[in-house]
């Protein structure tokens, strides 16, 4: 009998209950008992939803108060000194949130948050563990064991989920001194042994150990460590399933297949070609879990196609076949049943986490009971849906396809080199040394959100809505003028999300009402869905930016989202390549850039926050991606005069290893996230002479803590050691949408003061 199981479920809730509870707790409006009650309710609801869908073995340990990697850090006692209790007490929820969000100066002298970065190539973020050379590990957090008891008390068959020891170490960074993280392995392994043995005592039969780094290019010493680690852990008296995802095992396939564990999960959505080899190499005693339902997208599974593989696998494996999503459903919205505004045709093409669990269960049942009436019915429905989607005229637009086919190499090149452009731009803009600016968005107040919501619901006329947004723009411009910022932004009050705002105005996108996924902590995003060929029917931002520019003599930046970020932060099509979708988006944005320039806007920022996120996990696949991603950016930015300055912004982008490709984008100014990593990103400039201007972020906007002027001066001086002062800009790490006005103004006052101090001492 094939078994249906799941690797993980979204934790935020159908209506983002976790987000609302977290934020109420942080504001002091909900106590810890209330927060914990919300968590218990969500876990119970999610386990029941999976069970009702037909999942036989439920994941436990996939719930996290902020991030699953942070949960593991607390579990192992990997708590930086600045967050440790002075009396040596065990960590609390307050400790967890302090590590994630930082502590303000008014509390215990202040402590900056841990670094946050992308979870592999997804739009989820994790808190990077900080390891010291003398790192000690101790079991310090009981959450996993408590949740196992919760689930068992509710009558569920459970499969606890833990991040494997090698993946956990790989994800962390060394602090204080440079050393080999593998040196910590012998200190860490006893904790895994303790955890596994405690789970066995709790009656757990199977544990899922996530080792996604097996889909990466691993150094030989890390490969060598695998067999030793799992030889040690095999002593624990419970069965172990190693879960790999986000890519193929490739050169790690033999290693993974032969680890001394009881089962292996592989991702057949991202890497279907690995199936025949793994089937041949898998020892005869092992379970093979096949991830055939896409855990990272919203499209309904082609059940017949998946069944072809599963039927073949079942002939070989029999009861050793498990059926699963490709990865945790953390990256999928919760429940399509909540969507009551989508048209029936589009809705029939989609599946969210609950529906994906149903698909997994149906596939397992189709193997076990192929003649069952519900199996026959659902498979017939699936065939009909796949046919309609493949032939729908809503998807294919000949005019868009013809324009993409007509793209020439010259279309993605500026007319002159940077040296010639920057001379004209400096003359026209007349900015001081160390020019100050922000990344784009300002705080989204409840009044702003209410105005947008009322307009969408028809409760506010268009004229009243425009005046409400104009009022917010006037407020943002006035504050920036008073602060003394040099290049201004309009604040983006009219934008709900940097992708959704544009996607709403492009043909080829569709929107959900409840398609939320977690980005980090309480931050949820609702990715737009690309379902067809993409084009821009009319200008999207010009009137707002023109209005803002009319309020000031200073330069006002036009603010756009770049093609790669639009693609990476949307749920993309599966029927055409990402490259084709990026080119369609680039042409639409190119038209907007030209319109902004024609309206008198001298600076246009095209954000590519997700540029590095698109990199394939395997380095051998990087060149092709970097070629089309940089070409897409240049395509949307190149049809302007020399005098028009093109900016781009990248956040959470560790791009030391792709700095040449960043330079190939040929943006006149790039702003990047650097403060959390203490300007570590700038190490790239020691070996590569980046030719254009750069604004390394001088403070972390993800924390409510207000940085001091002295901290920012120190970071800028550090940056000036690697980048000529005449090419340095001064800016925050990212947009200020999620912050409140008081902390925003206080931080920007200090930032402007830091820039002025550098000008005075330059």
Curated annotation (Swiss-Prot):
Molecular-function GO terms, alphabetical: 5-methyltetrahydropteroyltriglutamate-homocysteine S-methyltransferase activity; zinc ion binding
NCBIfam families hit by this protein? met_syn_B12ind (TIGR01371), PRK05222.1 (NF003556)
Its cofactor is:
Zn(2+)
Task: Name the positions where L-methionine binds.
Answer: 439-441, 492, 607
* Full protein name: 5-methyltetrahydropteroyltriglutamate--homocysteine methyltransferase
Enumerate the UniProt keywords alphabetically: Amino-acid biosynthesis, Metal-binding, Methionine biosynthesis, Methyltransferase, Repeat, Transferase, Zinc
Q: Which residues form the active site?
A: 702
One BP annotation, GO: methylation
Task: Give the EC number.
Answer: 2.1.1.14
InterPro entries documented for this protein: Cbl-indep_Met_Synth_N, Cobalamin-indep_Met_synthase, Met_Synth_C/arc, UROD/MetE-like_sf
The residues that the entry says bind L-homocysteine are 439-441, 492, 607
Cofactor details (free text): Binds 1 zinc ion per subunit.
């Amino acid at each position: 009998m094939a078994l249906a199981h799941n690797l993980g479920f979204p934790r935020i809730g159908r209506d983002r209950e976790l987000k609302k509870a977290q934020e109420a707790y942080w504001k002091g409006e909900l106590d810890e008992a209330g927060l914990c009650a919300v968590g218990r309710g969500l876990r119970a609801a999610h386990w029941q939803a999976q069970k009702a869908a037909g999942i036989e073995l439920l994941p436990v340990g996939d719930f996290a108060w902020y991030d699953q990697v942070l949960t593991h850090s607390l579990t192992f006692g990997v708590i930086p000194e600045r967050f440790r209790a002075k009396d040596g007490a065990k960590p609390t929820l307050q400790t967890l949130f302090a590590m994630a969000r930082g502590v303000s100066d008014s509390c215990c002298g202040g402590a900056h948050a841990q670094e946050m970065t992308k979870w592999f190539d997804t739009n989820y973020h994790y808190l990077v563990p900080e390891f010291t050379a003398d790192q000690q590990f101790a079991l310090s957090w009981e959450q996993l064991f408590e949740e196992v008891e919760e689930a068992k008390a509710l009558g569920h068959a459970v499969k606890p989920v833990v991040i494997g020891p090698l993946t956990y170490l790989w994800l962390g960074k060394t602090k204080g001194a440079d050393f080999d993280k593998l040196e910590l392995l012998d200190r860490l392994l006893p904790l895994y042994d303790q955890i596994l043995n405690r789970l066995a005592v709790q009656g757990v039969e199977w544990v899922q150990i996530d080792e996604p780094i097996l889909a990466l290019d691993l150094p030989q010493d890390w490969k060598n460590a695998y067999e030793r680690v799992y030889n040690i852990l095999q002593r624990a008296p419970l069965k172990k399933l190693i879960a790999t995802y986000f890519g193929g095992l490739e050169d790690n396939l033999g290693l993974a297949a032969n680890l001394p564990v009881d089962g292996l999960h592989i991702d057949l959505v991202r890497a279907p070609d690995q199936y025949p080899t793994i089937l041949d190499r898998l020892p005869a005693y092992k379970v093979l879990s096949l991830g055939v339902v896409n855990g990272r997208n919203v499209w309904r599974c082609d059940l017949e196609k998946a069944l072809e593989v599963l039927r073949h696998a079942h002939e070989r494996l029999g009861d050793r076949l498990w059926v699963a999503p490709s990865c945790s459903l953390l990256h999928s919205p919760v429940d399509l049943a909540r969507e009551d505004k989508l048209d029936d045709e589009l809705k029939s093409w989609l599946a969210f986490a609950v529906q994906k669990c149903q698909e997994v269960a149906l596939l397992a049942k189709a193997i076990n009971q192929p003649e069952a009436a519900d199996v026959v019915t659902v498979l017939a429905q699936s065939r009909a849906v796949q046919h309609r989607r493949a032939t729908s005229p809503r998807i294919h637009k000949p005019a868009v396809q013809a324009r993409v086919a007509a793209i020439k190499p010259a279309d993605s090149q500026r007319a002159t080199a940077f040296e010639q452009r920057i001379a004209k731009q400096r003359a026209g803009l007349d900015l001081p040394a160390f020019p100050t600016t922000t990344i784009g968005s300002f705080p989204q107040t409840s009044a702003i959100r209410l105005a947008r919501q009322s307009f969408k619901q028809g409760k506010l006329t268009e004229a009243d809505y425009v005046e409400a947004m104009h009022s917010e723009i006037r407020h943002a411009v006035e504050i920036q003028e008073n602060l003394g910022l040099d290049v201004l932004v309009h604040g983006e009050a009219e934008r709900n999300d940097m992708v959704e705002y544009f996607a709403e105005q492009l043909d080829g996108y569709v929107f959900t009402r409840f398609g939320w996924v977690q980005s980090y902590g309480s931050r949820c995003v609702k990715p737009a869905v690309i379902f067809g060929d993409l084009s821009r029917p009319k200008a999207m931002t010009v009137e707002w930016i023109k209005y803002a520019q009319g309020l000031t003599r200073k330069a006002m930046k036009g603010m756009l989202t770049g093609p790669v970020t639009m693609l990476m932060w949307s749920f993309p099509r599966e029927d055409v390549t990402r490259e084709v979708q990026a080119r369609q988006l680039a042409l639409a944005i190119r038209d907007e850039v030209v319109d902004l320039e024609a309206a008198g806007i001298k600076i246009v920022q095209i954000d590519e926050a997700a540029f590095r996120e698109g990199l394939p996990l395997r380095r051998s696949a990087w060149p092709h991606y970097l070629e089309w991603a940089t070409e897409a950016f240049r395509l949307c930015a190149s049809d302007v005069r020399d005098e028009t300055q093109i900016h781009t912004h990248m956040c959470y982008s560790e791009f030391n290893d792709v700095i040449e490709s960043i330079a190939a984008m040929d943006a006149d100014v790039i702003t990047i996230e650097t403060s959390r990593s203490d300007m570590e990103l700038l190490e790239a400039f020691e070996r590569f002479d980046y030719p254009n201007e750069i604004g390394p972020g001088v403070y972390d906007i993800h924390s409510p803590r207000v940085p001091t002027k002295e901290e920012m001066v120190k970071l800028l001086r550090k940056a000036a050691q690697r980048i000529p002062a005449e090419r340095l800009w001064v800016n925050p790490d990212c947009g200020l949408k999620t912050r409140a006005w008081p902390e925003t103004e206080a931080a920007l006052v200090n930032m402007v003061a830091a820039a002025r101090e550098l000008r005075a001492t330059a």
